[in-house]
Amino acid sequence: MSRSRWIFAMVAALSVGAACSDNPTSGSARAGTLTLRLTTPHADDGAMTFEVSGAPIDGATAVDASLRLFTRRVDGSTMVGAMAGNLANGAVVTLHVPDVGAAARYTATVLEMANRQDQLRASLAGYALTVAP
């Protein structure tokens, strides 16, 4: 085998290997899920409305079957949601996204919060939502 054919064969083999790799190159998107986590100063939260935006969102599901989630897509990269149930610190929503590498582009905001007796909180101080893999 000539040297040029051998080099061509090696380059072809490496290219095929890279194309079949589980580690995509930096320019390719990888669909998956991100987690929306709630930070709350109270132990008796029962409902909230929130907004997530920044990058495309395909859908959302509650992380726990005891939580009820309703969503409305504002546009391709903004979703408004309402969640009811015994809300506590930690994961509350799973976001289905076309590119998990874009996690840093998402922002999430608590719009309203109510206690378990359906009374709106007078202040949202201490509440936060974060989006992370």
Where are these regions (language model features)?
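Sec-dependent bacterial lipoprotein signal peptides
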Residues: 1-21
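Acidic, low-complexity intrinsically disordered segments
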Residues: 20-133
